[in-house]
Amino acid sequence: VDLISGPTALYLAHPRINLVPVTTAAEMYQAVTTRFQDVDIAVMTAAVADYTPVEPEDQKIKRKVTGFTLQLKATLDIAAEIGRTKRNDQIVVGFALETDHAEENAQKKLLTKNLDLIVLNNLTEPGAGFRTDTNRVTIFGKGNKRADFQLKSKELVAEDIVEEVYHLIRGISHA
């Protein structure tokens, strides 16, 4: 297993997990796209960022009396890129962090990015999202398939996702 991750305090003791550290969206894109041809399943747990500075600074930007305008550009969409290049024998799982029109946006991403499953993380749900140890997700699959899950620990949510991937492989996916 290759775990491509930005800066983290995770301690990985398992000998079969290879941590690939990255610090920028461009490094993440490079790490994912160069390894993707050799994987059976890719789980894209989060977008790096939707936007990145046009001119990144390597030092602190000092406060200016006249104000400051930060110019941003869209980052490369890594999930869309691997969805575009995936083979029929590969599975790609994406995630959608949404606040409005959540189900519609998640299903649109599933199709436009050519994903096999997408995990909807709706930030408007109580107990879901960031700053909590719980989550409530809906997993969508192609052909209008869906699986709704109750609020539970994020560890159990991860197990649900793995189970849905297993069902997809076996041809009995609920999502």
Describe each model-derived feature in a short phrase:
Residues V1-L97, H101-A175:
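A cross-family phosphate/adenosyl-ligand binding-site feature
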